[in-house]
A protein has these predicted regions:
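Charged, solvent-exposed interaction patches on well-folded alpha/beta domains
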Residues: 3-145
């Protein structure tokens, strides 16, 4: 599957074509079928399972996910550690990691809250945390196993 392509005309009579393959970023279940969401922002029907990409739950637009993914990429949060993403009608996201931690993000100030959750997750004092709730401004709720 193609994310983008470039065509250059080389004079006098040749073309140089570059094709960039799309990367699969997440799984989505819609109407009982499995789709892959590509870096080209398109849904691709699939029957194959690819390990280590998150499953997205909820009714979201591909732009909603793209915005979240771009914010995660701007931080030190490791996208490959995300097992599930939950999108809510209010427009906010929850992140579940492979280590079993659920991060409840607010609708606003996503980038700084993603950075804060990464700091908490990498601090050994909080290694048994299974819930980080950042929905309330100036307040963090954490729960240990």
């Amino acid at each position: 599957l193609v994310e983008k392509y470039e065509i250059f005309k080389r004079y006098p009579s040749s073309l140089e074509i570059k094709i960039y393959k799309t990367k699969f970023l997440a799984y989505v279940k819609k109407d009982g079928e499995n789709f892959l969401l590509g870096s080209n922002n398109k849904f691709i029907l699939t029957k194959n399972i690819i390990e280590k990409i998150p499953l997205i739950h909820g009714n979201f637009r591909s732009d909603d996910f793209k915005n979240l993914k771009n914010l995660i990429d701007e931080t030190n949060f490791n996208f490959k550690e995300i097992k599930n993403l939950y999108f809510f009608p209010s427009g906010r996201w929850d992140i579940e990691t492979y280590s079993g931690t659920l991060i409840k993000l607010p609708k606003n100030k996503l980038k700084e809250n993603i950075e804060l959750s990464e700091i908490i997750l990498t601090d050994n004092r909080f290694k048994n945390i299974n819930l980080i709730d950042l929905r309330q401004e100036n307040q963090i709720v954490m729960n240990e196993q």
